[in-house]
Amino acid sequence: MSAINSIAASPTERLPGPLVFTLAAGAGLSVASIYYSQPMLDIIGKQFNVGVGAVGMVPMLTQMGYALGILLLAPLGDRHDRRVIILIKGLLLVAALLLCGFSGGLNALLIASFATGLTATVAQDIVPASAALAPERSRGKTVGTVMTGLLVGILLSRVVSGVVAEYFGWRAMYWLAAALVLFISLALWRVLPRFTPGTSVSYPRLLLSLAHLWQHHQTLRRAALAQGLLSVGFSAFWSTLALMLSDRFHLDSAVAGAFGLAGAAGAMSAPLAGSIADRIGPARVTLVGAGLVTISFALMFLLPALPLPAQLALIVLSTIGFDLGVQATLVAHQTLVYSLAPEARSRLNALLFTVVFIGMATGAALGSLALARWGWNGVVTLATLAGAASFALRLASRHLKN
């Protein structure tokens, strides 16, 4: 029996730190692939000589591919060896990223971006794999560490892509990403044991069970819709930030990517939000989080009244606020959803994140449209209304429950 199998079979030991780190790195590098384009949109648009609305389709189709991949591919982890799935999807993600880097025009980049989103859902296979490997007594800590890796991947993706695109070109970012994903995919194949499938149910029946879970659990529907609305504002902001900073402040993609550092508070708040949800209840955390998101976006209506340095400071402050609110609300919604049917957590997770990334795709599309037609105030209005709608939904859910 290998060392990994021995440790995974023991209920009293923790997984080795290097294994947990590899899982966290795999989740982070995989999900980062769907965010690299955002700080580079201005550079890509200029190279292909297309407008804001057209280049905004890149993040939209990436998010759409991710949402579809979660819905159609994530359930396969219940039926097949996750080790094999992680390797295959990782190699397909490498191919998609290379296609992005070698795209000769916008249409080719759009197709490759959709494929990138579809295959980047390997991150949603790595997180359940970590839960399956970890002994029960340390499972929460292990999954939390892997989720932190995923969130840090989202955060650093914008910072790294902004810098790489500015100094080496946007294509170099995709080539670098492909190399990193190839390395971590092979590393995961080497360290992971084989997984015994949890069910022999056919693939069509797995998909049908998703519909049953969605129809049966009202709490799931409300949580998914509320988080999806927050994702609309979140994605609208990040999908248009680089374009706005270039137009209004004449800042390059490296600076736009550096704004991702302001999201560190959001990434680091995930464990804290979970602890608070345990003490005061996840429903209250969702209300506070949605309210914080709404207020943070609304503050940016003050930008025209401020001098330029103060405008940048306010954008940073708002970014910290809404990122914190979005991540805290997500953790609380996961707590609500996972308690509904423990035996179906993978599928519940797939449904929740499908709606989240539909919101991401919608926000990217509407954000680009709003920026092109109404400027930055249009983006701020869209994001604020989406946050307010999420807050109203959580408030209504609480009143109905009472």
What are these regions (language model features)?
Residues 108, 138, 145-192:
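Helix-loop-helix hairpin linking two adjacent transmembrane segments in secondary transporters
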Residues 284-332:
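C-terminal transmembrane helical hairpin of 12-TM major facilitator-type secondary transporters
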Residues 122-134, 326-341:
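Intracellular juxtamembrane helix-capping segments at the cytosolic ends
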Residues 112-150:
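Cytoplasmic helix-loop-helix junction between adjacent transmembrane helices
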Residues 70-81, 269-282, 371:
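Helix-to-loop junctions at the C-terminal end of transmembrane segments
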